[in-house]
């Protein structure tokens, strides 16, 4: 009902925005059937019909942004009775890979995912970022959409481990993030803190999407570079 109301108001020209988080387009209430506290969140997970409605809203533009809803908790807050456990899960490390599952399943285009996770959030909040135009802040994430992996604790940078996605097969991942033109995160690549002017084609197989910055990547290889806003 909330999505239908949002869709109706947008069709009327009302300036409203909506966001969702990856767990709402990936999981259903069945994930909490065994009282797994890592599946306890607020709002709670709903039915398969609700999940399908969220997916449709992502596809048709009713939902403007995908946010992580990152909510780290200690073991003490989660390893207890379901009723007493804290709400929320971590989402920084799993948000992009889960978004890439929608691309792999042909539900979203790479460009639409970029809008949902970078350009739209920056535009809605009125903050710099979400753009690869000349003069924009050099915040970039390099993505390998072909680098599938099984999500494990080794992929988590947060101190907290409260995620329901351990063991999930992911179709792709972020392999490098630049902030202000400096490398701040890399997965199996070079050492940190190289400048943006470095010719990355010698180090990173991939292509850049979209491109305007002085970064050279081979377009015939598999990879995407997108603004880093909301992908960290």
Predicted regions and their residues:
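Short, electropositive alpha-helical surface patch
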Residues: 3-18, 73-90, 122-127, 202-218
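Short acidic, glycine/serine/threonine-rich loops at helix termini
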Residues: 5-9, 27-32, 76-80, 153-155, ...
């Amino acid at each position: 009902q909330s999505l239908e109301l949002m869709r109706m108001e947008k069709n009327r020209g009302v300036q409203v925005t909506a966001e969702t988080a990856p767990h709402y387009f990936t999981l259903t209430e069945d994930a909490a059937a065994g009282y797994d506290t890592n599946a306890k969140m607020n709002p709670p997970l709903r039915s398969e019909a609700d999940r399908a409605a969220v997916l449709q809203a992502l596809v048709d533009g009713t939902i403007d942004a995908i946010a992580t809803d990152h909510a780290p908790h200690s073991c003490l807050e989660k390893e207890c009775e379901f009723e007493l456990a804290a709400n929320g899960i971590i989402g920084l490390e799993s948000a992009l890979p889960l978004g890439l599952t929608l691309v792999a399943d042909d539900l979203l285009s790479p460009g639409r995912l970029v809008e949902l996770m970078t350009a739209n959030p920056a535009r809605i909040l009125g903050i710099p970022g979400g753009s690869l135009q000349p003069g924009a802040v050099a915040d970039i994430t390099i993505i390998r959409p072909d680098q599938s992996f099984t999500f494990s604790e080794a992929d988590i940078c947060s101190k907290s481990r409260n995620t329901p996605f351990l063991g999930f097969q992911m179709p792709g991942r972020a392999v490098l993030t630049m902030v202000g033109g400096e490398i701040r995160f890399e997965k199996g690549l070079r050492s940190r803190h190289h400048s943006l002017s470095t010719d990355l084609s010698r180090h990173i197989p991939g292509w850049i999407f979209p491109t305007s910055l002085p970064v050279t990547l081979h377009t015939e290889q598999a990879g995407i570079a997108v603004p880093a806003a909301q992908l960290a």
